[in-house]
Amino acid sequence: MTIVLGIDPGSRITGYGVICKQGKILSYLASGCIRTKTNDFPNRLKRIYIDVNQVITQFKPLVFAIEQLFIAKNMNSALKLSQARSVAIVVAMNNNIPVFEYAARQVKKTLVGIGSADKHQVKHMVRTILNLSNNPQTDAADALAIAITHCYISENTNRISSKNLILARGRLR
């Protein structure tokens, strides 16, 4: 059993999603949004740190998956996003949880089959894959999508790695 925490970073709203992977079965554990209500940016970062740490303490994930940065037109927004993202990564590292990063296009392609999918399509697939009765909030759905992507990609990577190891051993005999 592997518990995966997915994070969709943001300086005002950070989404989180926690899922459990047992074999090929993915189960929903929790999701939500960390809303930073203050205009004081250092206090927003502090709120992200505290709340992500609480989620980690409660669910004890073995894996931390987060969205990679994308090139933004507004440099100030990109800097704030990178700082919020960095704070979340530091929380994971302080808890000795390995960090994996996924591009937004990769997440969309993994869940929907096309890298240019819209938020509604991603939300629908998250709801379908995790058998949810309602759509999660947008940022929480994105975080769950990142966690699901990690499960799918790591499963395929492990399968490929194992196959290569067997072939390599076969050649050595």
From Swiss-Prot:
Q: Which GO terms describe its molecular function?
A: crossover junction DNA endonuclease activity; DNA binding; magnesium ion binding
Location within or outside the cell: Cytoplasm
PROSITE patterns for this protein:
RUVC
Question: What EC numbers are recorded for this enzyme?
Answer: 3.1.21.10
Q: Which InterPro entries match?
A: RNaseH-like_sf, RNaseH_sf, X-over_junc_endoDNase_Mg_BS, X-over_junc_endoDNase_RuvC
Q: Which GO terms describe its biological process?
A: DNA recombination; DNA repair
Write out the entry's keywords from A to Z. Answer: Cytoplasm, DNA damage, DNA recombination, DNA repair, DNA-binding, Endonuclease, Hydrolase, Magnesium, Metal-binding, Nuclease
Which reaction does this chain catalyze? Endonucleolytic cleavage at a junction such as a reciprocal single-stranded crossover between two homologous DNA duplexes (Holliday junction)
Taxonomic superkingdom: Bacteria
Binding residue positions for Mg(2+) 2: E67
- Cofactors named for this entry: Mg(2+)
Summarize where Mg(2+) 1 binds, as residue positions: D8, D139
Q: What GO CC annotations are associated with the protein?
A: cytoplasm; Holliday junction resolvase complex
The UniProt note on the cofactor reads as follows: Binds 2 Mg(2+) ion per subunit.
Positions of the catalytic residues: D8, E67, D139
What's the main place this protein lives? cytoplasm
Q: What does this protein do?
A: The RuvA-RuvB-RuvC complex processes Holliday junction (HJ) DNA during genetic recombination and DNA repair. Endonuclease that resolves HJ intermediates. Cleaves cruciform DNA by making single-stranded nicks across the HJ at symmetrical positions within the homologous arms, yielding a 5'-phosphate and a 3'-hydroxyl group; requires a central core of homology in the junction. The consensus cleavage sequence is 5'-(A/T)TT(C/G)-3'. Cleavage occurs on the 3'-side of the TT dinucleotide at the point of strand exchange.
Q: Which PANTHER family match?
A: CROSSOVER JUNCTION ENDODEOXYRIBONUCLEASE RUVC (PTHR30194:SF3)
Summarize the subunit comment: Homodimer which binds Holliday junction (HJ) DNA. The HJ becomes 2-fold symmetrical on binding to RuvC with unstacked arms; it has a different conformation from HJ DNA in complex with RuvA. In the full resolvosome a probable DNA-RuvA(4)-RuvB(12)-RuvC(2) complex forms which resolves the HJ.
Under HAMAP family, the record lists: RuvC (MF_00034)
Q: Which family does it belong to?
A: Belongs to the RuvC family.
Q: What is this protein called?
A: Crossover junction endodeoxyribonuclease RuvC
**Organism this protein belongs to:** Baumannia cicadellinicola subsp. Homalodisca coagulata
Q: Could you read off the lineage of the organism from its UniProt record? A: Bacteria, Pseudomonadati, Pseudomonadota, Gammaproteobacteria, Candidatus Palibaumannia
